[in-house]
Each structure stands twice: as C-alpha cells, then as structure tokens.
Amino acid sequence: MIGDVRDYERLKRAMQNCDIVIHAAALKRVDMIEYNVAEAIKTNIMGTLNVINASLANNVKKVIFVSTDKACSPINSYGACKFVGERIIIESNFNKGLSKTIFSCVRYGNVISSTGSVIPFFIDKLKA
C-alpha cells in the first residue's frame, strides 16, 4: 500500500482481508533521523504499533517486521527505533488476547547498491 503507517484508520482499512502483512515502512536515513528523532519515533515506533493494532483488528494471520542489523547494540536513533520495533513486535505474540496472529521479525544486512553498503568496499579489497 502507499500511505502512512502513522494513519491508523487508513492502515486498518488497507489490511481488510489480508492474510500476511510485511511491515517495511520506516524512515531509514540515519543522518536525517539524528536531526528528526521525534519524526522517526512517530513513524518507526508508533507506526509499528499501528501495524500491530490494525493487524489484530483485522485478524491478519502473520505479520513480518523488516528490521536491520543496526538494531543489534544500536549506536544511533535509527538502530534504537528498530530495536524497539523488534521488541514490540515480539511482545505482541504474548499480548494479543485470543488472536491467532503470528508476529515475527527478519533482519537484513547490507543491500547491494544501497547507500552505506559495505559490499563495494569488500569488492575493492578483493581486487587489491
């Protein structure tokens, strides 16, 4: 869907009749987030809570939260937001009442050709 995870009502309507939700919405530019922490919290944490609640309201079978390796021992606001996002997703498995929704997380590492990827660095080192 194209929309804003901060808009709970629209998110809830978008999830009607969905079996699986892949939650990849996030502000991800580390430099931008450091100067806009409140916006990152609204999108990356509160938006995740909206995804959880809308999924439960619609009896979605499975929710997959796309996280990052930056959530491990976070050193910046982006990593901290993803760390919290993972925790509330996992916690939702224990605080969902009678719902059968399964919440899980996946972490990606370095995406080829993305800004900040270490893959080009390793390729250059291998060529040397």
Q: PLM ranges: what are they?
A:
Residues 1-20:
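Conserved Rossmann-fold cofactor-binding substructure of NAD(P)-dependent oxidoreductases
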Residues 6, 71, 111-113:
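Conserved sequence/active-site signature of Rossmann-fold short-chain dehydrogenase/reductase
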Residues 16-17, 59-60, 99, 127-128:
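Short loop/turn elements that form and flank the Walker-type P-loop nucleotide-binding site
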Residues 23, 27-87, 91-93, 101-103:
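Conserved Rossmann-fold NAD(P)-dependent oxidoreductase catalytic core, especially the SDR/UDP-sugar
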Residues 77, 83-128:
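NAD(P)-dependent short-chain dehydrogenase/reductase
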